[in-house]
């Protein structure tokens, strides 16, 4: 379960992972933003994927913000593979990536009420909550972890 760098040929698999998590974890309206991110930022922003038996089943990135922080972005696991340790492996790899950069003093993320507990288990604390911030029924839970 070691992440590898995203390749442009992974786009279809990553969009399929996104689609498998709609509408509980992502709002349908977010798909265009994710697709645009994959086309424009995934390669230069060190986006990562995890493969199982040659199939991409998880993906996520780390966005360097330039203000002493880095942000976990677009982290997701194919819905049928939740609770198998893939999300944790991906999150830990991105945390190690951030911790290795001396310019990063804190890691931020925007998640939902559905995954807030997962990130709390990795040392993140809630900064604020915006009701329906990611879409109807999907609160934006802003979290951070100070290094």
Model-derived features: positions:
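A short beta-loop-alpha structural element at the N-terminal edge
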Residues: 1-14
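Helix-loop element at the rim of GNAT/NAT acetyltransferase active sites that forms part
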Residues: 15-29
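Active-site rim helix/loop that mediates acceptor-substrate recognition in acyltransferases
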Residues: 26-48, 52, 56, 61
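Conserved acetyl-CoA binding element of GNAT-fold acetyltransferases
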Residues: 68-80
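Conserved acetyl-CoA-binding loop-helix of GNAT-fold acetyltransferases
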Residues: 77, 83-96, 121
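Conserved GNAT acetyl-CoA-binding A-motif
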Residues: 91, 98-112
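Conserved catalytic-core motifs of GNAT/GCN5-like acyltransferases
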Residues: 108-110, 120, 125-142
């Amino acid at each position: 379960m070691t992440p590898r760098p995203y390749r442009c040929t992974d786009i279809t698999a990553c969009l399929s992972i996104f689609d498998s998590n709609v509408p509980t974890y992502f709002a349908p309206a977010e798909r265009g933003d994710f697709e645009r991110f994959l086309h424009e930022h995934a390669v230069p922003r060190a986006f990562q994927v995890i493969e199982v038996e040659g199939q991409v089943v998880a993906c996520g990135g780390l966005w360097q913000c330039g203000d002493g922080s880095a942000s976990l972005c677009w982290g997701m696991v194919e819905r049928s593979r939740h609770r198998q340790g893939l999300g944790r492996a991906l999150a830990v790899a991105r945390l190690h990536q951030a911790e290795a950069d001396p310019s990063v003093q804190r890691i931020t993320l925007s998640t939902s009420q559905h995954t807030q507990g997962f990130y709390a288990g990795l040392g993140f604390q809630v900064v604020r909550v915006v009701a329906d911030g990611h879409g109807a029924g999907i609160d934006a839970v802003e979290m951070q972890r100070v290094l």
